[in-house]
Amino acid sequence: MGSLWSSPSLLPSQQDNETEPFSHLPKEIGTDPTLREDSNVSNRNSEAASTSTDSSTNTNENHASTSQSSLEGAPDSGPIKIAIIGGGIIGIITALGLIHRGINVTVYERAPKYTETSAGFSFSKGARKAMEIVSPRVLEALLRVAAPNKHPFIRYFDGFTPGADEAQWQIPAERPDYYGCLRAAFLESLGQEVPEGIVKFGKVLESYEDNEEGKVLLRFRDGSTAEVDAVIGCDGIKSRTRRIMLGDTHPAAAPGYTEIVAYRAVLPLEGVVAALGEDRGHSHCLAVGPDAYTVSYPIANKPLANMILFRKQRGSWANSDKLLETCHRSTAQDAVKDWKPEIQRLVDLLPENPNKWAIFDTSDNPVPSYVSASGRVCIAGDAAHASTPFLASGAAMGVEDAAVLATVLNTALKEQSYNKTTVVKRKAITAAFQAYSGIRMQRSQRVVKDSRTVGEVCMWQDAETARDPEKCFQAIWQRYTQIWEFDVEEMVERARSECVRLFS
């Protein structure tokens, strides 16, 4: 029998504010622990410099309007300009995919410089295939800092019931073939691939005008504007792009609280080994029980381990604009006070005043489409489908988004190159974004739903599985295999074909 307990790692939107400096990187790269609660960053590739217009004119600047009839045949031979809102991991990976294909892109990041957390996360072999499709440089960046699980199995343990000491389920680690690393290390590695000038920092999106002229006018908090042909919102779980696209009152404009919180830390490996024992401490293990569960695993080739405690916290979250708060370690210890001694020892390793993250997602109110009515604005990653971390696939879904977006935009622009008019350019962008949304909606939204279910199963909250090990295994196995066995290349090819069909 196999286990499917993979390595739930928090999404970008749920990361902490612990950061590591990237002192050897160019200019603005550094850390700012006050700015990265819901947005992570990383960026670099070497083929194009952005020419996107970014002016410091005020919001009353006159943009001469052109009648629809005069636009129909108007020549538009200039390079297409794509804006990505959000310089997180998915925003940067998407940018690298466009740069790799020679597409003009500028990333607008709200933070004043690159920052990232010191937490760990992992990518399956399917996610790595998607990275390779985006750009070989993305995969190279990961492999520079990541390492596979050294233990031959990923194992599930009952962390609560006395006497239940053996792993109840396990699977060969080669099945998902996770490669784990520190988020900060991956950012640093990606940063080595981004051309200078691609990312504009300190750009907080206030609004955009998606007008009939075929351009999108972005307005930023600092009073500057930028006019582009298309926008990709990769601005995280609290996406401003999504809110503008849907409207403030739309049910899907904001994410919802899942009544689960997480305590996470990167710990000395020797401490984890002392708590769990030599075998478990050096491997990828999950311990589940009532209203909580833990995940622990070594990080890459470092003497460190990633540890997360998830627990139920029912009711509402007081401030949905702030997804983390500092608490006392005792609040985490209370969640496992009746658990086995080794799990209590593991949780005791948390710092005295750890951060507690409220886990939000978009499961209750999914967006109706990933593309705006005009077809020139779309959303990706957490902005489109913010997930809980229980399927360990939230970041992977964003990478798949990037693979599809890079492919369909490249396809559409090749089709458009034979007729460079404003209308044809608009049609090309719309075809690309609609193909992306149509291909990605079902899979990514299913992951959001399934991840929520896996969390309930792990915390013995699911009515159908309760504490029955076999039922828990079957419920989770089904959902994990749909992630692991997915054909990313076939999906990308379907998206390419759909884009051509929509453009023709």
From Swiss-Prot:
Biased composition (Basic and acidic residues): 25-39
Obligatory cofactor(s): FAD
EC number of this enzyme: 1.-.-.-
One Pfam entry name: FAD_binding_3
Disulfide bonds: none
Biased composition (Low complexity): 1-13, 45-62
Gene name, Swiss-Prot/TrEMBL: pkfD
Deletion consequences: Abolishes the production of Aspernidine A.
Keyword Mitochondrion carried by entry: no
Region spans: Disordered: 1-76
Main enzyme class: oxidoreductase
InterPro entries named among the record's database cross-references: FAD-bd, FAD/NAD-bd_sf, FAD_monoxygenase
Pathway(s) per entry: Secondary metabolite biosynthesis
MF GO annotations: FAD binding; monooxygenase activity
Keyword Flavoprotein: yes
Domain of life of the organism encoding this protein: Eukaryota
Function: FAD-dependent monooxygenase; part of the gene cluster that mediates the biosynthesis of aspernidine A, a prenylated isoindolinone. The starting point of the biosynthesis of aspernidin A is the production of orsellinaldehyde by the non-reducing polyketide synthase pkfA. Hydroxylation, methylation of one of the phenol groups, and prenylation, presumably catalyzed by the prenyltransferase pkfE, would be needed to yield aspernidine D. Subsequently, the cytochrome P450 monooxygenase pkfB is responsible for hydroxylation of aspernidine D to yield aspernidine E.
The name this protein goes by in its record: FAD-dependent monooxygenase pkfD
Active site location: 264, 297
